[in-house]
């Protein structure tokens, strides 16, 4: 972006204003790809930047969502379910039921508590649906589960 474009944005939207140069985001992803080993997968965390999905979806291997709302945005953007990692602590039976009815079990699901494990196991068994899961092990903080819970 040039100075004149930035002035126009400031005059139109006020300051402070947060601006993404989509071409720069795409260039950074390509740069990461060039610097990392060929078999390295890249995952874009949707979080507060769901508007970047149309620009990054084809450049990364996966998109990580942490809420049912973020998953819904991926559905609207027609992201293939197998490309989505469902992460975060906001997993309820109903939200996972909705997600799994759409994904048919495709994608990756993180387990961040015993409750998440129970929800995913119940829904997988009920629907005879194998799931790919990652267990988020705690390093002694409030996030994840301790290794003794599952191993």
Regions found by a protein language model. Name each.
Residues 1-132:
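A charged N-terminal "starter" segment
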Residues 132-138:
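ATP-grasp fold ATP-binding core
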Residues 122-126, 139-151:
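Active-site loop/helix belt of alpha/beta enzymes
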């Amino acid at each position: 972006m040039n100075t004149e474009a930035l002035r126009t944005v400031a005059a139109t939207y006020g300051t402070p204003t947060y601006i993404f140069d989509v071409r720069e985001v795409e260039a950074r992803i390509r740069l990461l790809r060039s610097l990392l080993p060929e078999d390295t997968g890249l995952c874009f965390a949707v979080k507060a930047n769901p508007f970047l999905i149309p620009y990054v979806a084809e450049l990364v291997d996966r998109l990580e969502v942490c809420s049912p709302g973020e998953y819904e945005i991926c559905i609207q953007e027609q992201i293939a379910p197998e490309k989505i990692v469902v992460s975060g602590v906001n997993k309820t039976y109903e939200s996972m039921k909705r997600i799994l009815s759409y994904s048919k079990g495709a994608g990756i699901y993180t387990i961040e508590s015993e409750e998440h494990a129970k929800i995913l196991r119940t829904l997988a068994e009920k629907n005879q649906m194998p799931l790919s899961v990652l267990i988020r092990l705690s390093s002694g903080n409030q996030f994840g589960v301790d290794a003794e819970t599952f191993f």
